[in-house]
Regions:
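Extracytoplasmic gate region of multi-pass secondary transporters
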Residues: 48, 226-267, 277
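Helix-breaking motifs and short loop linkers at transmembrane-helix boundaries and internal kinks
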Residues: 59, 91, 112-117, 256, ...
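Conserved MFS/SLC helix-loop-helix module at the cytosolic interface between two early adjacent transmembrane helices
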Residues: 78-114
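Helix-loop-helix hairpin linking two adjacent transmembrane segments in secondary transporters
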Residues: 116, 147-149, 155-203
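Paired small-residue
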Residues: 117-126, 314-322
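Cytoplasmic helix-loop-helix junction between adjacent transmembrane helices
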Residues: 122-160
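Intracellular juxtamembrane helix-capping segments at the cytosolic ends
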Residues: 132-145, 329-343
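A late C-terminal transmembrane helix in Major Facilitator Superfamily
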Residues: 346-379
Length: 410
């Protein structure tokens, strides 16, 4: 056989190998997208447009409906805290599958309002599934991803959050025409279907012995930079609260435009959330995660501040879409930055990501309660909320700039 034949065969084998590599990678990304859509998009964000219906149909009093929303935040924090222990006990892939099943069950269980305690317990569990999925999904897939594709693949994974936000403003109102019970059952069925479709799409999990064999203690500087990154991520959570919690109410009651107009801006927020992770992930692959993160904080600070200065429709549209884009779009940037700071240990990467997710959950809960308290005691001053959110994003940018300077000196 001639040398040209050998080269041709090698070329075909190489092409086939790369094709096999590419196909599972996108399959893994779609599994991650399904997980974030089920555990975060549907189990969490779909609850927001259900609140008026829960009150109108007399399932719960207005104050109880608010507490049920808080139950999800508490569960999310708990999920972030237990995720690594659960993965160590039964494996990350098994944990993700169990959490997706549990999230589906939570929606089905909420179809019957047996009591406040019953509903509260299931909403806590729904939040817990989201916390576990947020910690484990991407950190399970990204070790199988080439360095120049980590941003894009991370963006695909977290686009599920954006799809859930968009569904909360479009699909859920349509389902509510059939009734509350039917809506919860449909959300549960959709979650179960996504769980089934992604069941065999996850990567084969590596044994922990490999991670232990390659484990090297993190340097002090890297640890300090990761701590600073966690603080930035927490402040970013506070920056998102004004739009996530108050945007619809601001348009509907603050501007007197009604709930229909408020819901329209929420749909715009959701549309931004769909494309946000893909755009930020692509930017990170081109420019690096550090520069992309700093750019994101700067743009976000401006976008969050806009409603404090103008209520013009064009301004509110831009603000809704941009902040919506960064709600899930910031996630692949922070996760990718962790992989840059801790390049050689998947165990340390997962630990740092769990720490960052916990910081986000804690700051988000504190921010939601704190801004709600401030809003009530300010006589309903919406501008204050957006100003505080913008200041939090600016604070995250300041910390990241200090971290960048510190990293260059090492």
């Amino acid at each position: 056989m001639s040398m040209s034949s050998f080269r041709l065969n090698d070329h075909h084998r190489s092409h086939a190998h790369h094709k096999r590599v590419r196909e599972p990678l996108w399959l893994y990304a779609l599994a991650g997208l399904c997980a974030s859509l089920v555990g975060l998009g549907l189990a969490r964000f779909a609850y927001t447009p259900l609140i008026p219906a829960l009150i109108a149909d007399k399932w719960f009093a207005p104050s109880d409906a608010v507490y049920l929303g808080a139950a999800n935040l508490a569960g999310y924090l708990g999920g972030a805290l237990i995720a690594r222990r659960l993965a160590a006990r039964i494996g990350a892939i098994a944990s993700l599958r169990v959490m997706m099943l549990l999230a589906s069950l939570c929606c089905l269980a909420c179809a019957t309002p047996l009591s406040f305690a019953w509903f509260f317990g299931w909403r806590v569990l729904a939040g817990l599934t989201g916390g576990v999925i947020m910690v484990l999904a991407a950190s399970t897939i990204l070790p199988h991803t080439p360095a120049d594709k980590k941003g894009l693949i991370g963006g695909v994974i977290f686009a599920g959050v954006g799809l859930g936000i968009a569904a909360s403003g479009t699909l859920v109102p349509l389902l509510l025409r059939q009734g509350l019970t039917e809506t919860w059952l449909a959300l549960g069925a959709l979650s179960a279907l996504l769980t089934l479709l992604s069941w065999r799409a996850w990567p084969v999990e590596a044994r922990s012995t490999e991670a232990l064999a390659n484990h090297q203690p993190a340097q002090h500087t890297s640890s300090a930079l990761v701590t600073m990154l966690c603080a930035e991520y927490g402040l970013n959570a506070v920056a998102l609260v004004p739009h996530m919690v108050f945007l619809v109410d601001y348009v509907a009651r603050g501007l007197g435009q009604g709930i229909a107009a408020g819901s329209a801006y929420w749909v715009l927020y959701g549309l931004g959330a769909i494309v946000g992770p893909l755009l930020t992930g692509h930017l990170a692959d081109r420019a690096g995660f550090g520069p992309a993160l700093r750019t994101a904080f700067l743009i976000q600070a401006v976008a969050v501040a806009l409603p404090a200065f103008s209520a013009a429709p064009a301004v509110l549209i831009v603000s809704s879409v941009v902040v919506g884009a960064f709600t899930p779009g910031i996630v692949p940037l922070v996760l990718g930055r962790i992989h840059e700071l801790i390049p050689h240990s998947s165990t340390d990467q997962r630990a740092a990501w769990a720490q960052a997710t916990t910081s986000f959950a804690l700051f988000q809960a504190l921010g939601a309660y704190g801004l709600s308290w401030g809003f009530a005691h300010s006589g309903g001053h919406y501008g204050m909320l957006f100003a505080i959110g913008a200041a939090a994003a600016a604070g995250a940018l300041a910390i990241e700039l200090v971290a960048a300077l510190r990293g260059r000196r090492v």
